[in-house]
Amino acid sequence: MIHRTLTVASLLSTLAMAQGTTLAYRVPFQLDPSRGAVLETTFDLGHRSGTEPDLLVFVDPGAERDLLLAWFPEVELVRSGVPFGAITPTVPDPGYYTTAEILQQIDLFVAAHPDYARRVDLTTLPGAARTHGNQSIWALVVSDNVASQEDEPAIVLAAQHHARELNSPHVVIGAASRILSGRGSDPVLATLVDDYEIWLVPCVNPDGVNHVWAVDDFWRKNRRNNGSNFGVDLNRNYPAGFGQCGSSTITSSQTYRGPSPASEPETQTMRALIASVRPEIYIDIHSSGREVLHTYAPCLPPSATIDAFLDRYLDSLRSPMNYAARDPSASGEAPEDHWTSSGTLSFLIEIGTAFQPPFAETILEEVRVWPGLRQAFTTWRPAVRGHVRSLRGLTPLEATVTYTPNQFSHGEVNRSRARDGRYAMWLPLGNWRVTWSAPGHESHSRDVVVASYDNPLAIDVDLLPTSVPATLAIAGSGRVGTAVGITYSAPGDVGLGYWIPLSLGTSPGVQLDGRTLPLNPDALMAASLSLSPVLENNLGVLSGTSTAVATLNVPDIPALAGVTLHVGGLTLDASFPSGIARWAPPTAVTIQP
């Protein structure tokens, strides 16, 4: 009997190697914690913990299988992967989606709700790419006025980074159905659709899913050709913490992280989506375990402040579903990357207790998961929302937004959206110094007090373009009855207007677009618009050298001796809200007897 079992196992293994399919092994007894930890951090498990009884371990034929058998010789081969489309007698369940059926379902939503739903090929976004199998990755966008890109926050819900997790797309498609069908009768969902842009991505890994249906129901990875084997674990391929823990360099491994961060087209496409829409919330659906994962991998722990802050939202997500919480299995996962690179509040949900349970169980699981998703989408709100724009033309900027005291240690950064400058900041309660920065512009900082959660402060910021500083040069003694030469230089401002005014003081100045022009708006300044012949050539167009020369003819009035005039130089530009682009620091001229 033992010989027969070994022979069957050998045949299955040989067949798996020939077909490139996955092997499932069973651990026949419960491991002690130390061995369980090794198993959990090295291999792909069908359960949440390496110490659970009756544990399934999935490996590819070759080096990974050899490593498993060397370290855990007690494991028993269950079977190799087979085409999911050929499994009998009860599955394939007609409820599970092939990639073609997912696209068909998206099209049905669009046909039924043309004003609120549209299909988008994510691989056409800047920085995205078609899969190794030359496939698109499709999204359903839900919003009012869905044909246009409105200035409103975004949410992303995605599934099936791992191909075999056939129950995960049903949660995304179920959410789409609930939102679209419920918006007409549910005021909360109506507000969600009116105020947000919701991106639903049922399948991130179409090549892998096709392989599940046609060849191997255990298949996890994408279909990169590694030479002697195939596939990269997409949820180990993201740049945040790439290779730090929980992934493998063995190409045949179920958790092979790929040759480099974001090497895979599917990863590139999802990162392109995040960069394009800068969502406030990202939720990733996986299976299985009935858990919500912490955002940070255990090898890259956050500060205590950020950990407690994220736990608040994790608990808000899992409680309506009665799910547990746990650490991620590895670094390089999507939620950590989207939080780290964009400031998007991100979590991963492991649904159900199997990858492909009877479809009736998946239907019930979607019902169980929806209240958590609904709570996240309709109640979670960032601490601060707003826009970052350039003062020149009020054009939107893709800016970085940071704050102090710094609570981050892994390169985390928040970014605004390029198309409209919209940003969102998720901040713990407290007093913070927030700084907005963009290339070619001066940074701006201000104090922000976060007194309550999910009650956003509205802060729009206009940044001043940087340039070589403008200067003023004064020539002449300033004696009564003499002329004083005034040269205003504003490098780069060729052809723009200029104004060289006078004022009797510099404080409190004039408030312009959040800036302070250090000249008082007194009668002398007003008269500077038409003070000829006392002030000549002080209003005009900057020359080809970005300079202007004006003349102050000091009246021959002895009583003026001792009076101090403050001379300014301003560049005029109608693309700025105030019409004033910049100025040189004012220079004082004291009239001499």
Predicted regions located by residue number:
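Residue-level hotspots within well-ordered secondary structure
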Residues: 466-593
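A short, solvent-exposed beta-strand micro-motif common in secreted/extracellular proteins
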Residues: 429-440
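Short, acidic Ser/Thr/Gly-rich low-complexity loop/linker segments typical of extracellular
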Residues: 395-428
